């Protein structure tokens, strides 16, 4: 086994960005073969999160984690990762930025003890509030931002390879409120009393046209 090359490939996957078509081409044979990519991505994200917490001498059961969750499969990745972390004892809240959630991942997350904060008044998520007023929507957004700002780790699972252009609507608003619209942080865990990590589960980019 060529472990040196394996390590190089892992580093490349962790720290490189690929356009959406390339990601789809890489995924297609694995999906055709029935590889459980969503569960694998979630497990990897959860493991990286636990490693970051350990590096900061913070026990998982003492950690407060925010998962920014969109409606698609990337949101499912985040929910499954959140479920793993919740089962390990972390306090995990999923901040739902869209009107629905990946059904199976949502069920796994709730079963693991995760909590859900819905931001869209038109959301249709089982067991969660819906049809609330514009005033309450603003209060929920503020609560979500404050929760994320006070979290040790933020998992960004709002969008995946299906998105094009800048973030809009609730995802755009919450990203701007958290200061996540510019460059990535210099290091994943900040040197303060409450380390924070922005861990995109997947970043797909198109080159400028």
PLM features: what roles do these ranges have?
Residues 2-18, 58-209:
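Glycine-rich phosphate/dinucleotide-binding loop and adjoining beta-alpha-beta core of small-molecule
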Residues 1-62:
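Positively charged, low-complexity intrinsically disordered leader regions
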